[in-house]
Amino acid sequence: MAMNENAYPTTFPSFERENHRDALRQPFDPAFRRTWSNGVALRQLVDFARPTVANHTMSYALIEYCLSRLPMQHLERLGQLKIPVELHAAPFQYLQKHHRACGFDWVERFVWRTHDLHKPYNFLRPELLLAQESGSQRIVALLTIMPGEDYIRHYASILEVAQHDGAISSHHGPIRCVLYPHLTQSMMAWTGLTELSLSVEPGDILILGFVAELLPRFASLVPTARVIGRQDAQYYGLVRLELRPGLVFSLIGAKYSYWGNLGGRVVRELAARRPRAICYIAKQGTLLSPGDIHRTIYSPTRYCVFDKGQACWHGDDHSALPINPLSSRFPTFDRGLHVSTPTIVEQDVDFRTQVEAHGASSVDNELAQMARALTDVHEENPSMERVQLLPLMFITDYLRRPEELGMTVPFDLTSRNETVHRNKELFLARSAHLVLEAFNVIERPKAIIVGTGYGVKTILPALQRRGVEVVGLCGGRDRAKTEAAGNKHGIPCIDVSLAEVQATHGANLLFVASPHDKHAALVQEALDLGGFDIVCEKPLALDMATMRHFANQSQGSSQLRLMNHPLRFYPPLIQLKAASKEPSNILAIDIQYLTRRLSKLTHWSAGFSKAAGGGMMLAMATHFLDLIEWLTSSSLTPASVQDMSTSNSIGPLPTEDAGATKTPDVESAFQMNGCCGLSTKYSVDCDGAADTELFSVTLRLDNEHELRFIQRKGSPVLLEQRLPGREWLPLKVHWEQRVREGSPWQISFQYFAEELVEAICMGTRSAFADKATGFSDYARQVGVFGSKVGIA
């Protein structure tokens, strides 16, 4: 008895169901089963040694991965009913329409729902069907997949692992695979890509991969962009986005997975339209370090296709290999040779050893196939302008070495883990920036860092994280230290003047993190040169007159003149402020900062000298005053300070002169309290020579509730709340992204730097300046306490 389609949950909306019924209307030869399909056993199709958990780079997760790709609940039930399973490389609509030519009296969908209709693309997945063989009452289950040689082998290998593990019944012997070669060969035509690609204009930049996620990001980053064309077909979608006259991004999404060499077929079809470039933003695995998972962008320039343990195509052998337009700007993104292989199941430790011997650093299933397809197109059409290939790859797993199989690796190939989602969002945001920069839609700044302490430890990695090219590094007396840092990070100009680096490398962003008494001269030099956005560490200068002069000189400038006050960009403190709801709700703010910074020092340094701008007041006080102003949306004045005291607990320290010592003439600790706004009281307790590391901010609200941020070194950030007469409890907040681990000063600077770079790239300096702390704000903040500590 035939099954009623309406009795089972459909996986498509009604309009989409009708489209699928009309698909693949090809005439059939009555001898179809003999001429247009062929059946083989799994082992024939897989044709590589079946891996085990003992020799696969996924180790214990191999079985879990394979079973997660199959409808195991239904396959187990089918096994109990002794219903055999076949793998068919054809979509359901094809088999249903032509079921008699395929040898079945009827074919219907089973209840397994595999289609995620919340996703606009890449949602079509293998389906489980039931069919009755012609001329008998024998029922068979058909696992149907989209055709494509590599995709077929991939699913065949998954089934083989599952059957060998006992998860799928072996009652009927090896699983039979039925192939439809004509569907594979004509796939670009019957899926509609050939027709859809006619809407692509020569010179377009094509975006593949995470297109639905990137479209709103492109539109947000380029507010003047406009959609000039949109198509939605059965298997694809196209949006043409004009960034500026003459520059169009064509974002093409596929509703199925163009796995392995299908990716090459897609790219070859699109290359016929003569686009300027094809950008592929997707995920891959790494052979380099598990620390790269979810964190590091890979953008290869060299490619190799591997199959059955052999390199069957190597891009190094071809002069027509596509160029990566980003490689010259960000050479560190090119980690080495990229390898593509038909199936993840093939990636056992022997495979890893073989590809590593070829110099491989990363692996996926289709990127090298795309590079191969473009290379073939270039070689077949030597007179055509070559199509560029820009891959931006998100690392989701690490291929372990034989000795590492016991290692726990935080991979998540399904990308359903919450942490993966958060890091994927960061990757997509950065990828959107990088694609726009690669085609000169936006331009990242080129930076000079002055200072090899905080400058190299904190500023440099934060800028590199955002893709900023650091073109100059200036240090102090220890030139060898500066050269070593510069060489390590590929910085071209070492201890070269600002004017020269600006002239030779186009430097336009300056970070001043030198010794305190050198800040003023550097800021003045940059202001006189012009053309620099400036971010200065505290202090801006050692006297109020110079600070006010810089503030006045910066008035009306379209460029940024900022102090490094990053706490207002720190997500935990942003959440603390949000939890207070309104600044007027805050009755009191208590800030405590304890650090071993000074007590760890065993020799005299400029930090202990008033003449050199040392002491905790100049180093830290404005951080806390700035935080108070931000929390209360108010400005402090000298009258805001009711009481202030300083102290020094550091004794004489040895100097460079043998036997000589010096006693600090600045404070190692300070306390201050007062009022701000209409009625908010504040207190600050800062000790630079404490025996612990602690930073806390406590808010007392007008409803008698208390909120607290607290961070101890080596411990996670705590956000807490306390009701009257109760214990401290965790504050429930919604994090848009995982808070990075590390010092609040380093991490808050990373967030500050990210927004800074985006503001410069997108021409939104004014809005960012309103959010940050400028020279004039800083001069006013120092004026709150300056006269009390001898800063005139």
Curated annotation (Swiss-Prot):
Disruption phenotype: Impairs the production of cordycepin.
Keywords for this protein: Lipid droplet, Oxidoreductase
The enzyme's E.C. designation: 1.-.-.-
Associated pathway: Secondary metabolite biosynthesis
Entry annotated with the keyword Oxidoreductase: yes
InterPro entries according to UniProt: Gfo/Idh/MocA-like_OxRdtase_N, Gfo/Idh/MocA_Oxidoreductase, NAD(P)-bd_dom_sf
Biotech use, per record: Cordycepin has antitumor, antibacterial, antifungal, antivirus, and immune regulation properties; thus, cordycepin has important value in commerce, medicine, and scientific research.
Leader peptide range in chain numbering: none
Enzyme class: oxidoreductase
MF term (GO), any: oxidoreductase activity
Subcellular location: Lipid droplet
Note: Cordycepin and pentostatin biosynthesis coupling is an important point of metabolic regulation where pentostatin safeguards cordycepin from deamination by inhibiting adenosine deaminase (ADA) activity. ADA is not inhibited until cordycepin reaches self-toxic levels, at which point ADA derepression occurs allowing for detoxification of cordycepin to 3'-deoxyinosine (3'-dI).
Complex formation: Interacts with cns2.
Protein name (Swiss-Prot/TrEMBL): Oxidoreductase cns1
Organism: Cordyceps militaris (strain CM01) (Caterpillar fungus)
UniProt lineage: Eukaryota, Fungi, Dikarya, Ascomycota, Pezizomycotina
Gene this protein is translated from: cns1
